[in-house]
Amino acid sequence: MANAIVEKAKERFEQSHQSLAREFGSIRAGRANASLLDRIEVEYYGVPTPLNQLASITVPEARVLLVSPFDKSSLKDIEHAINASDIGINPANDGSVIRLVIPALTEETRKELAKEVKKVGENAKVAIRNIRRDAMDEAKKQEKIKEITEDELKSLEKDIQKVTDEAVKHIDSMTANKEKELLEV
């Protein structure tokens, strides 16, 4: 039972890391990256549909994204969804594909995005601490109902803290890498 608590915490930490990676992927760093468009949903026949299900997204050049719809009739809807999103890129529709030219980031924009990255990283750490608290509470509950001994509880708490520290270190590393990527000129 004790190992199950640690394994469950590890699993939830991994989900937090994946969520953070997706979040960082959607923060543009001056380079074209298909994940910039991951959050965009297109009204397609009245149903909100993720853009990546309606079109192939390629990166032909370092700062250009090419959106090629599978159904050409959805071109206008895709263009409208990109315009309505908060990514700050204007689509250029040439009748069969949509070109997105990623503008160079100004120093001020880079610093703002770096602040945003720090904030997102801090939120991920809060999520990690909440997962740790849940695991600790579960361990104490197990000790209270005599499923584990007091010594096993102390050992379990150390294990939980160890995996928590590793998860926080991983988040710090991910945050530092994204900040470095943003501040590169």
Swiss-Prot record:
Q: Name one GO molecular function term.
A: ribosomal large subunit binding
User: Is Cytoplasm included in the keywords of this UniProt record?
Assistant: yes
Concerning Pfam families, the annotation shows:
RRF (PF01765)
- Please state where this protein is localized: Cytoplasm
SUPFAM superfamilies, per the entry = Ribosome recycling factor, RRF
Superkingdom of this protein's organism: Bacteria
Q: Which residues form a coiled coil?
A: none
- GO terms for biological process, alphabetical: translational termination
Its predominant location is cytoplasm
Q: Which GO terms describe its cellular component?
A: cytoplasm
- Provide this UniProt record's keywords sorted from A to Z: Cytoplasm, Protein biosynthesis
Q: List the NCBIfam families hit by this protein, alphabetically.
A: frr
Instruction: Tell me, in a sentence or two, what this protein's role is.
Output: Responsible for the release of ribosomes from messenger RNA at the termination of protein biosynthesis. May increase the efficiency of translation by recycling ribosomes from one round of translation to another.
Family indicated by similarity: Belongs to the RRF family.
Query: What HAMAP family does the record tag this protein with?
Result: RRF
What is the name of this protein?
Ribosome-recycling factor
What gene is this protein a product of? frr
